[in-house]
Every structure is written in C-alpha cells, then in structure tokens.
C-alpha cells in the first residue's frame, strides 16, 4: 500500500480575510465556510474511529497497520488545525457555528455503537469527500476569484 504523506500545510491564516472571500460571491463563500465549520468535529471523529479500530485488531494486524493509521491521523489532525484557524476568523466576523455543538452531541449519543459502525461512517464520509474533491477539480469555477491563500 502507498504510504500516506502527512503534509504540514503552511497557509497564512493569521491575516484576516473578507466574509465574501470566494470571488465576492456571498453564496459560494457561505457554502464553503459552512463546510469548513463542520470539518474539525468530523476530522476528530475520524481520528478517534480509526484509533479505536486499530486497537480492536489482533496484535499482528495492529503492527501491520500502525504506520498507515499514524499517517491518516497526522493528515486529519493537520486538516482539523487548518479549519480551526479558518473558522476562528469566521467566528471573529460574527459567523455562529451552531453545527459543531450539535454534531458533538450526536457523536456522543452514538458512542455506544460498535467501532465498525464508526469506521463505516468514516469511510463513507471520506469517500464523499473524495467525490466532492474530484468534482471541484473538474469545476474550477466554484472557486473562481477566491482569496488565493485559501
């Protein structure tokens, strides 16, 4: 299997950005900003699910999967950190992230479910993200005129 490369993305998120950062378009900016607000909670769920899933494997399989899991966790932690920085600016502009608290509450209510269910949700969500990313690559107009550093 191909090794996961954890990219330490260096994006300037110290400098504020405009609320309509996506080409001045209110809808496109709000759409992608709302997505960003949902990501940190989801990424932490993915990390927790994969970490718990690894623990459930027999010792031999744990050893085989450890590096891959470490790479996945590193990648997700990097994404979470970047979205948290982005979301901090959104909050400073007055955007209220009500999704995160509700998502955390739902995740806690489902904590009793089998780790396989959590891994299935993780895999399905990652697949959706990959399909969405592919769509984005084929439709650059979705980010036309966006703040270049974002």
List each language-model region with its residue ranges.
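Non-heme di-metal
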Residues: 1-150
């Amino acid at each position: 299997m191909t090794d996961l490369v954890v990219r330490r993305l260096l994006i300037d998120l110290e400098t504020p950005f405009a609320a309509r950062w996506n080409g001045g378009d209110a809808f496109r900016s709000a759409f992608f900003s709302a997505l960003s607000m949902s990501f940190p909670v989801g990424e932490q769920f993915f990390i927790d699910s994969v970490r718990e899933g690894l623990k459930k494997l027999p010792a031999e399989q744990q050893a085989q999967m450890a590096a891959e899991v470490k790479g996945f966790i590193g990648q997700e932690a990097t994404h979470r950190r970047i979205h948290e920085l982005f979301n901090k600016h959104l909050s400073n502009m007055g955007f209220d992230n009500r999704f995160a608290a509700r998502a955390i509450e739902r995740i806690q209510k489902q904590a009793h479910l089998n780790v396989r269910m959590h891994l299935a949700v993780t895999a399905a969500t990652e697949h959706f993200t990959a399909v969405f990313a592919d769509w984005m690559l084929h439709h650059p107009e979705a980010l036309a005129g966006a703040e270049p550093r974002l």
